[in-house]
């Protein structure tokens, strides 16, 4: 089997206007970025308001492992399969961040014969959306320090500035810095730090905004500092929102690309699910729903993170509701959750598979607790044995009364996921229950955190450090107590310990810090050792990425 990059380069791509025709998007509504990428015009999107919406399919996964699960690959394969069985389907994905591309993960455009293309452009600069978000965030940072430099009329307390800087890169050296050094002309020295762009509240606002007006209003609500008498200061107070909206105007238009089979995909926005809310933009999702029978979208990492936030944050704010949910699992990842070392995964091990099944079992039960119908998509790898697949299907049937379907979209494209597509349609067109949430917004923030920890993570309780407790009390006092919560924790475990695999129970969820995201409309809860600025691994992917003798990129996949 050729590599992902070889498969992508061998593909014959359709002109983007032909892809747009499948969704009924006219040429005049496209802003082309070359032959195979386009943005969809704001005015055309506004014209869709009030149109009936198709069915929404959410793709999530078990707790990820270094073995890889293939959630994006499954999302693409499922979208292609739905088109193959006669449904007009579009995929809605997040844009990749440069940090993971050059760090540990590599590219994020699917794999094998289930990819979105042109994948090199998608994985790198794409249409410049992340640059626009980084620039808007940086403009706000500059305006804050400029306001303080010129007399500080708002009486901002330089010890209580919450607005950190961002860059779309994994760079641990920037987590904590000193700024404005070098003399009076450079401003007032203070401690500062950088987060990765995908953790920026601008990114969250970008992905939750309904339109440009909503974007600007949300930006204005962002709390960036406190005054000396402990009153909140917003971006509207420093008059940043108009210029920031100008920088984001074109970026807010969704990006249209295609799969290897020529089917449409909207790729827009990219918050991580372990340190942000992990969903693509509301604008892209709504656009897909108004243009297609089925919109297939993914939520980052496992269902305890991305799917929970998709429901408790994105669906709560927008009224969206998935008609069916696919939980992606792999034989090898379940064996890792059952205690097998990565180097031993190729050997058949039914005992470890059954032990690791506890992870999938909890994710399925968690998704069902929201009132959503579930099917398990088993992403097939060539090392898997027939006995392992048979045992997993048996476990799903007997212990969960849920169907598990082996999918071979990586090797076969949409044809390898037709059975999954049929199951998704059956669930989506079947009986639907009301959507329920993990908590009610009327409860205190601490109660919301505890509800997620105990109901979804299997924890005995939460443990809030004193700094976080003080900040939470302040949020309640300032009127932010009814906001939902966005849990920032390791993606590798239901606990805050990334080495605790499977389905641990009875642990404590440690809350180290909290951050207010008033514009996005949630409180970020930082648990355990999770960082909002990742670092590079000992051997980063960047070590092997280069241009070959023909000027083509090598090593991105």
Curated annotation (Swiss-Prot):
Disulfide bonds: none annotated. It holds the Pfam family FTHFS. It catalyses: (6S)-5,6,7,8-tetrahydrofolate + formate + ATP = (6R)-10-formyltetrahydrofolate + ADP + phosphate. Its EC number is 6.3.4.3. ATP binds at residues 65-72. Keywords: ATP-binding, Ligase, Nucleotide-binding, One-carbon metabolism. InterPro entries: Formate_THF_ligase (IPR000559), Formate_THF_ligase_CS (IPR020628), P-loop_NTPase (IPR027417). GO terms for biological process: tetrahydrofolate interconversion. SUPFAM superfamilies: P-loop containing nucleoside triphosphate hydrolases. Gene3D superfamilies: Domain 2, N(10)-formyltetrahydrofolate synthetase, Formyltetrahydrofolate synthetase, domain 3, P-loop containing nucleotide triphosphate hydrolases. Pathway: One-carbon metabolism; tetrahydrofolate interconversion. GO terms for molecular function: ATP binding; formate-tetrahydrofolate ligase activity. This is Formate--tetrahydrofolate ligase. It comes from Methylorubrum extorquens (strain CM4 / NCIMB 13688).
